[in-house]
């Protein structure tokens, strides 16, 4: 059975954001506005998404 995934898209710039939030975007694999990555839906990934919820859009 395939693992559940979630699509995350960066919608706002990381310029002027807290360094921890920039690092979280990098950890999610996001590089620029409009960049989309598909990640496994794990509690750790969900925690990272919750940390930068105001800069990303999530699709299940």
Curated annotation (Swiss-Prot):
GO molecular function: structural constituent of ribosome
UniProt KW keywords: Ribonucleoprotein, Ribosomal protein
One GO BP: translation
KW Chaperone (keyword) present: no
InterPro entries documented for this protein: Ribo_uL30_ferredoxin-like_sf, Ribosomal_uL30_bac-type, Ribosomal_uL30_CS, Ribosomal_uL30_ferredoxin-like
GO cellular component, one term: cytosolic large ribosomal subunit
Domain of life: Bacteria
Keyword Metal-binding: no
HAMAP family: Ribosomal_uL30_B (MF_01371_B)
Entry similarity comment: Belongs to the universal ribosomal protein uL30 family.
Subunit structure: Part of the 50S ribosomal subunit.
Stated name of the protein: Large ribosomal subunit protein uL30
Organism: Shewanella sp. (strain MR-7)
Gene: rpmD
